[in-house]
A protein has these predicted regions:
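Helical segment within the ABC ATPase nucleotide-binding domain
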Residues: 179-192
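Conserved catalytic motifs of ABC-family nucleotide-binding domains
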Residues: 160
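Catalytic Walker B motif of ABC-type/P-loop ATPase nucleotide-binding domains
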Residues: 164-167
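Conserved ABC ATPase "signature" region
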Residues: 106, 110, 117-135
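A short, surface-exposed alpha-helical micro-motif characterized by mixed small hydrophobic
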Residues: 206-208
Length: 272
């Protein structure tokens, strides 16, 4: 069975989704729906299970138990079809610095089997959408971190996915670059009716970008809801930091900067 019984508003459905590594349970029987057209945030400290969950939903990591449906397709029964319907940007920068922006997009277009007669125009459109027209023929090693992130978003949208998965999309970026990425994500949701599921440590990112939020703690779903309503449920003056402390008993940990990207690039290549 490749199709789940979903109503038209649900694009991602997780049912008791679990992943173990030996005796350690990284994601513990998580059940959650994401509706069509949402920008949905997964918030949690390091080790909460956010990246493991994303890797299961993008079929890069099989679940130990449970099931999930993405764009109506089972991640267990038909992972190849899931990959055709989604875009994915890993946490660490995955673009090839020794290629130009345009060459990176051409590589991705081939990887995602974009029809040959459509590749040139889709690349032009994606570069324009991400405001990278003037940098298209420069080597990516000379791009800023924010430009690389926008290039990776362009790569992920080339095959017109219905769902976009982003793992810490603005980690390590300065405030101006972060807001540029947020603007592009809002435009992608508006212009293409795209559903976005992103992981984050950043409370400001959630407040500015996410329609709905799920907080993960030790691999379990602590709470889910609209960010402003979660705050009001704690107190009239509560912030998302207060919500996190209430459900998880501590302050969220911020992750560091970029590390070696080779493994993340190899992970991205396996999406093809």
């Amino acid at each position: 069975m490749t199709q789940s019984v979903l109503d038209d508003t649900v694009v991602i459905r997780m049912q008791q989704l679990t992943r173990r590594f030996g005796d350690f349970t990284a994601v513990d029987h998580l059940t959650l729906d994401v509706r069509r057209g949402q920008i949905f945030g997964l918030l949690g400290s390091n080790g909460a299970g956010k990246s493991t969950l994303i890797k299961m939903l993008t079929t890069l990591l099989p679940p130990s138990e449970g099931e999930a449906f993405v764009a109506g397709v089972s991640i267990l029964a038909n992972p190849a079809e899931v990959r055709r319907r989604i875009g994915y940007v890993p946490q660490m920068l995955s673009a090839d610095g020794m290629l130009t922006g345009r060459e990176n997009l051409l590589f991705s277009a081939r990887l995602y089997a974009v029809p040959a007669h459509e590749r040139k125009q889709r690349i032009v459109d994606a570069l324009h959408f991400m405001a990278l027209d003037e940098s298209a023929d420069k080597l990516v090693k000379n791009y800023s971190g924010g430009m690389i992130r926008r290039l990776e978003l362009a790569q992920a949208m080339l095959h017109h996915p219905s769902v976009l998965f982003l793992d810490e999309p603005t980690i390590g970026l300065d405030p101006l670059a972060r807001r540029a990425v947020w603007d592009r994500l809002r435009s992608m949701r508006r212009d293409f009716n795209m559903t976005v599921l992103l992981t984050t440590h950043d409370m400001e990112e959630v407040e500015n970008l996410c329609d709905e939020l799920a907080i993960l703690h030790s691999g379990r779903l602590a709470v889910t809801g609209i960010p402003s309503e979660l705050c009001k449920a704690i107190s009239p003056t509560a912030t998302l930091d207060d919500v996190f402390a209430h459900y998880c008993g501590g302050v969220i940990e911020q992750s560091g900067g970029f590390a070696d990207t080779r493994n993340e690039r190899n992970t991205a290549l396996r999406m093809g």
